[in-house]
Structures are given as structure tokens and as C-alpha cells.
């Protein structure tokens, strides 16, 4: 029997505690940062960087990612609403992050970090952050998959996914799910690409000494 499509019914939430949902997206996001920090710490130690540099870089990155991703979502995808309800920008627990906003925030943070902490070329810090970032990106895309979001165009391929179009109403109120037509699971495609990039960057850094040439990674 041939499969014509995969019906995706994953619940965005894992469980609730004290009235707050713990979602797959948030879990993947948090795990990505923790694993990313472990990789970054190993890289900084390998480079004999002064003690404290990695911790400071991590703090800069965390703050910049959250602020940048949140503002990116509000400005690029919900300006009409958030311009009328500016205090709702602070309600980050309700969801709404944009990866490109986070990227802009991180680049600004690394510029400040390089000026105030390392006093080195900004590319030195960017190279070292790029490696774990590829892995974090893969995990975040899996979070998007669990949220039934950013899927691709319709497809007749057997691995097309039928996502729940009204996922918020279905999840919150138990409404009958409305499925999309079979679509490309671009979240999975992108996650696999990020993993390939992560493997390549790890190889370049550890085997080809790419970290010695700022900007190469």
C-alpha cells in the first residue's frame, strides 16, 4: 500500500504546569542553547581564551536572541496589532519569535561583545558562534514542525505532510482539525541542512584549523 501523505497531528504542548504550557518549541529552543553553550565552551578552551569570555558571550547571545527574535516577530509579522497594543510585545510566553530578528540581534551583540570584551575582530566571535548556531537552528526547526508552522508548498510526493491549519483553535478549544493539503515539510528539510552545515563547520574548525582564519567559518 502506497502512502499518499503523512497526517501530522502532533500537539504543540508537552504538558502544563501551574497553568502554563511547556511547548516542544520552547524545549527545543532551551536544549539548543544548552548544547550550544557546551560546544562553545569547548571551542573557547581550545583557543585558550581568557576565563569568562565564553560565559559573557553566552549571556550576550541569549539576551540578543530573545530581544531580537521577539522584536523581529512584532515588527515584521504583527506590527498592525503590536503598534496598537505595545505592552503585548512583552508577553513573550504567548509565542511569536522570528529567527531573522534573532540573527540581527546576535550580530549587534557580538559587535558590542568584541568591542567591550575581546578587543578582537568581530569575525573571531562570529566564527565561533556560527558552529553551534547551526545545531540550534536544526532544533528550532523541529520546534516549528511541532507547531505546524512554516511548511512549504503543496506536493504530491509521498512524504508530504497534512498539517493542522487551525492548530491554535484545535489545541486550545478542541475544535475539529482542519488539515492542509499535502505540503512539503520544509522544517525537516531545513533541519537536515542545518545538521549538514554543523557537521561541516565542526570538521573545518577541528580538522582544518579554520578558526585561525577569521571570517572563514
Language-model region placement:
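Hydrophobic, membrane-interfacing alpha helices
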Residues: 1-217
